[in-house]
UniProtKB/Swiss-Prot annotation:
Subunit and interaction comment: Part of the 30S ribosomal subunit. Contacts proteins S3 and S10.
Stated name of the protein: Small ribosomal subunit protein uS14
Molecular function via GO: rRNA binding; structural constituent of ribosome
PROSITE patterns: RIBOSOMAL_S14
Keyword set, alphabetical order: Ribonucleoprotein, Ribosomal protein, RNA-binding, rRNA-binding
CC per GO annotation: cytoplasm; small ribosomal subunit
Organism: Sodalis glossinidius (strain morsitans)
Ribosomal protein among keywords: yes
UniProt KW Lipoprotein keyword: no
InterPro entries: Ribosomal_uS14, Ribosomal_uS14_bac/plastid, Ribosomal_uS14_CS
Length: 101
C-alpha cells in the first residue's frame, strides 16, 4: 500500500494540471509559432517556467485505485497487476479468466 501522502500528492498534481491546462496550451502555441517574434516567444518561455512544476501532465503517475501502487498499472482496469489477478480469480471482472492453452 502506498502512503496516503503519496496518493494525496497525485490528486494535487491532477488538480493543478487541470487548472493550468488552458494557460499551458496557450503559452506552448506561442512558443511553437514560427511567425511570432523572438521576444514574444521568449516571454512565453519565461511565463511557462514560472508555472508550478506539478501543473505539467508529465509529472503525473498512474496509480492503482485500491492500493496506490505506481508500478505494474493496467490502464484498462485502473488497477495494478496484483489486484487485477485477485479480482479475476474471484470472478469479479466479467469476461476475464486465467489463460489456459
Amino acid at each position: 500500500m502506498a502512503k496516503q501522502s503519496m496518493k494525496a500528492r497525485e490528486v494535487k498534481r491532477v488538480k493543478l494540471a487541470d487548472k493550468f491546462f488552458a494557460k499551458r496550451a496557450e503559452l506552448k502555441t506561442i512558443i511553437s509559432d514560427v511567425n511570432a517574434s523572438d521576444e514574444d516567444r521568449w516571454d512565453a518561455v519565461l511565463k511557462l517556467q514560472t508555472l508550478p512544476r506539478d501543473s505539467s501532465p508529465s509529472r503525473q503517475r498512474n496509480r492503482c485505485r485500491q492500493t496506490g501502487r505506481p508500478h505494474a498499472f493496467l490502464r484498462k482496469f485502473g488497477l495494478s497487476r496484483i489486484k487485477v489477478r485477485e479480482a479475476a480469480m474471484r470472478g469479479e471482472i466479467p469476461g476475464l479468466r486465467k489463460a489456459s492453452w
